[in-house]
From Swiss-Prot:
Record: residues binding substrate: M75, A76, H77, M112, E113
Biological role stated in the UniProt entry: Catalyzes the conversion of (8S)-3',8-cyclo-7,8-dihydroguanosine 5'-triphosphate to cyclic pyranopterin monophosphate (cPMP).
The species this protein was found in: Desulforamulus reducens (strain ATCC BAA-1160 / DSM 100696 / MI-1)
InterPro entries assigned to the protein according to its UniProt record, in alphabetical order: MoaC (IPR023045), MoaC_bact/euk (IPR047594), MoaC_sf (IPR036522), MoCo_biosynth_MoaA/MoaC (IPR050105), Mopterin_CF_biosynth-C_dom (IPR002820)
UniProt GO MF annotations: cyclic pyranopterin monophosphate synthase activity
Keyword field contains Lyase: yes
Catalysed reaction equations from the record: (8S)-3',8-cyclo-7,8-dihydroguanosine 5'-triphosphate = cyclic pyranopterin phosphate + diphosphate
NCBIfam families linked to this entry: moaC, PRK09364.1
This protein's name: Cyclic pyranopterin monophosphate synthase
Assigned protein family: Belongs to the MoaC family.
Pfam families: MoaC
Active site per the UniProt annotation: D127
UniProt key word Plastid: no
Keyword entries, A-Z: Lyase, Molybdenum cofactor biosynthesis
């Protein structure tokens, strides 16, 4: 396992200096899901939630969250994000899977931005549906793949191709 990069020799937290790192094309894909009562999923699909278009608002929230990551994660660098896609799969009878894909051409990866995007999209779904279903669960938020950078590529075993 690699050494932790956000601590100096004395154990003090610090922001990694990326000044000399090479700019490369970087992509991170993260997935997660919100599990809910089947009736809640039906309301989402039918556009019947009182707060409006649940998935549309969650998509915008996820995009905004990716761009706000350095304000939330102390050691995350403010970077030029070149693309954010938030997609959803309805998985009857009781869940919505969320996929966040974040891209940059920079000196550091976008894993934290993708994780933040999916997390906030899931929280937004919860917020918009909690009036009818307080038992929803946000779960299984994970990095599926990343490419670019010094540490190389990563692909989680056992993940299926995203179906749109």
């Amino acid at each position: 396992m690699s050494e932790l990069t956000h601590f100096d020799a004395k154990g003090n937290a610090w922001m990694v200096d990326i000044t000399e790192k090479e700019e490369t094309h970087r992509v991170a894909e993260v997935r997660g899901e919100v599990v809910m009562a089947p009736a809640t999923l039906e309301l989402i699909q039918q556009g019947g939630m009182a707060k409006g278009d649940v998935l549309g608002v969650a998509r915008v929230a996820g995009i905004m969250a990716a761009k706000s990551t350095p304000n939330l994660i102390p050691m995350a660098h403010p970077i030029m994000i070149t693309g954010v896609n938030i997609d959803f799969q309805i998985l009857p009878p009781d869940r919505v899977e969320i996929r966040g894909l974040v891209k940059t051409g920079g000196k550091t990866g976008v894993e934290m931005e993708a994780l933040t995007a999916v997390s906030v999209a899931a929280l937004t779904i919860y917020d918009m549906c909690k009036a009818v279903d307080k038992g929803m669960m946000i779960q299984n938020i994970r990095l599926v793949s990343k490419s670019g950078g010094k540490s190389g590529d990563f692909m989680r075993e056992g993940e299926s191709q995203w179906e749109k």
